[in-house]
Amino acid sequence: MEPSMIVVTTENVTGYRTVRMLGQCFGVVVRSRGIGGNFIASLRSIVGGEIHEYTQMLEEARRHALDRLVHNATSMGANAIVMMRFDSAEIGQTMSEIVAYGTAAVIEPAR
């Protein structure tokens, strides 16, 4: 992630004023577990409890979606993303889509 990009889930950034809203930006990742991972996960689902293979995959997918969101906002000329959210969906039976989205903005320190 770009070190100069501020990403918040709120509408405003404390201590900053919004100069310009640039519009919607997003980062999308679609992931699929391999056959081996699905097999191990299905065995674990019989016993119950956390399925670490899927947890790790989804954590990694969120990080990649956030990186893509920041890249998208940077290419728009933003130095901040406000109202950032994650969303997810299943595509078929073997794939997960993770979307990070928000509003790209230009902000500056409040006077």
UniProtKB/Swiss-Prot annotation:
<dbReference type="InterPro" id="IPR002765">
    <property type="entry name" value="UPF0145_YbjQ-like"/>
</dbReference>
<protein>
    <recommendedName>
        <fullName>UPF0145 protein BRADO6695</fullName>
    </recommendedName>
</protein>
<dbReference type="InterPro" id="IPR035439">
    <property type="entry name" value="UPF0145_dom_sf"/>
</dbReference>
<comment type="similarity">
    <text>Belongs to the UPF0145 family.</text>
</comment>
<dbReference type="Pfam" id="PF01906">
    <property type="entry name" value="YbjQ_1"/>
</dbReference>
